[in-house]
């Protein structure tokens, strides 16, 4: 998109002009490449990822985070959205992605809690829950 990067840089500069104590961030969509120049504009960056729910598998979360951290070891990275849907009346003794069961929802969030805890360099994480 022509002008997008310049606009983002202008907004970042304006924030710091108005309040130099305030950090800037941006939530990137999952398919934006790690090496995209947008990732270098704000003070910190986050990605919306739903690996293991809308596509891919649960283990893609840690693989992606570790690859981003390896590529940008000094760049603060966060997860601006993650999660999966569950329906209170759906249950499954063998939960799997896409079944909407409460059991898979528990598996998903327990997995995410573990990988988040193991990566102290994550600056923020946000479960998507309709906010």
Residue ranges of predicted features:
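Substrate-binding clefts and catalytic carboxylate motifs of secreted carbohydrate-active enzymes
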Residues: 5-29, 34-131
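Active-site neighborhood of divalent metal-dependent phosphoester/pyrophosphate hydrolases
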Residues: 1
């Amino acid at each position: 998109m022509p002008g997008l990067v310049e606009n983002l840089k202008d907004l970042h500069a304006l924030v710091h002009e108005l309040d130099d104590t305030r950090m800037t961030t941006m939530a990137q969509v999952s398919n934006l490449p790690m090496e995209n120049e947008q990732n270098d504009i704000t003070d910190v960056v986050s990605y919306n990822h739903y690996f293991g729910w809308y596509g891919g598998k649960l283990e893609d979360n840690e693989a992606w985070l570790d690859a981003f951290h390896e590529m940008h070891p000094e760049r603060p990275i966060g997860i601006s959205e993650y999660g999966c849907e569950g329906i209170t009346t759906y249950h499954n003794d063998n939960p799997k992605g896409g079944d909407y069961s409460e059991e898979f929802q528990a598996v998903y969030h327990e997995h995410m809690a573990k990988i988040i805890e193991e990566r102290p360099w994550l600056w923020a994480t946000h479960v998507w829950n309709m906010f």
